[in-house]
Amino acid sequence: MKIFFITSNASKVQLANERLNRYGIEIIQHKADLIEPQVFDVETVAAEKAKQLLGIVKTPFMVEDSGIYIEKLNGFPGALMKPVLDAIGDSGLIKLMSGESNRNALVKSVLAYCDPEKDLIKTFTGNYNGSISESIRGDMTRGWKVAKIFVPAGETKTLAEMDDMEWQKFLGDFRKDDHYEKLGKWLKSAFA
């Protein structure tokens, strides 16, 4: 089965292929101009992006959106992570958390799968709990916008501080039930 991934990010396509090939799914990059909905909820953003493409893309496709929800900030910035980080950076988020003891945060990633022939949009969510560090730490972003300030649950290092072995352990834990895994399992059962 082939699915278009509507993204300009080739690294996302490579990751999707790594994750979904074992389910017999080939991911092909396709670029399209999308209006990014400026709403708080990543599920809404992913579904709205998929709806924009329903009449344009004729074969199965998927879009992705991610956000970080900081508990003490009532979930801010959520799906607005990219524009917020572009505006205030990691240091701005750290400053917003100044003096706060509750630094809990949730990284949420959503894939919206769309089959235009069936007029179907289905979303798959992956969550990862952690906290916001008190300072910017580490050098490796590893493709995560919040890598220098996000500390995974049960860890003491930010993602950017992790060595390769620690990073692989984190990925292994994250991937057990992430959005790619959920999509792959669903497609396997739906088209078996």
Language-model segments: residues:
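Anionic-ligand binding patches
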Residues: 2-4, 11-192
